[in-house]
Swiss-Prot record:
SMART domains: END. The record marks W73, V74 as: Cleavage. It comes from Atelerix albiventris (Middle-African hedgehog). Residues 28-49 are annotated as: Disordered. Disulfide bonds join C53-C67, C55-C63. Pfam families: Endothelin. The keyword Signal applies. Residues 110-124 are annotated as: Endothelin-like. Residues 26-50, 74-202 form a propeptide. The gene is EDN1. This is Endothelin-1.
């Protein structure tokens, strides 16, 4: 396994923060020379990164692109490496955020920062549908095989009809999810192309 891209990104992040520490050290040395008469300056303000939601897995490229709006991505052969995930200061979480709510399911694709964000809520719930896809395909294969209900009676036939409807409904949901993800990918590619052409003109 090639660890060079990961080491390179860590070194970049480490050296990116180094000039700030040098500046802080210089400020401390000048204060000690002056006798510490002046109050210590407040730490430099850092803009907070807008984070729409938090993904259950950083390997989910679409989720990370959706949730972390301003992260620069570097494509490597194995996976996508984010730059500077640990750099911004995090705000403290309240106790109510530390415990999962009834609506939040650990099987979801991500967890929204705001419960009022309907787009985010729908996106995170879509992950649940993708995970159900494998079980749906298994059920569909079992449905194709079918049980021999001639000996079991009306109850078996009714159960097969209900399962068939459920599987068709799940199949329709998964198809709509696939198309929405395909559209999201196309939009992301168009955005990247516009950004590249815009940068190339300047």
């Amino acid at each position: 396994m090639d660890y060079f891209p990961m080491i390179f990104s860590l070194l970049f992040v480490a050296f990116h923060g180094a000039p700030e520490t040098v500046v802080l050290g210089a400020e401390l040395s000048t204060e000690s020379e002056q006798g510490g008469e002046q109050p210590s300056p407040s730490p430099p303000w850092r803009p907070r990164r807008s984070k729409r939601c938090s993904c259950s897995s950083l390997m989910d490229k679409e989720c990370v692109y959706f949730c972390h709006l301003d992260i620069i991505w570097v494509n490597t052969p194995e996976h996508v490496v984010p730059y500077g995930l640990g750099s911004p200061l995090r705000s403290r979480r309240s106790l109510k955020n530390s415990f999962p709510t009834k609506a939040a399911d650990h099987r979801n694709r991500c967890r929204c920062a705001s419960q009022k964000d309907k787009k985010c809520w729908n996106f995170c719930q879509a992950g649940k549908g993708l995970r159900l896809q494998d079980t749906m395909e298994k059920d569909w294969n079992n449905q194709k095989k079918g049980k021999d209900c001639s000996k079991l009676g009306d109850k078996c036939i009714h159960q097969q009809l209900v399962e068939g409807r459920k599987i068709r409904r799940l199949e329709a949901i998964s198809n709509s999810i696939k198309t929405s993800f395909h559209i999201a990918k196309l939009k992301a590619e168009l955005y990247r192309e516009k950004k590249v052409t815009h940068n190339g003109t300047h």
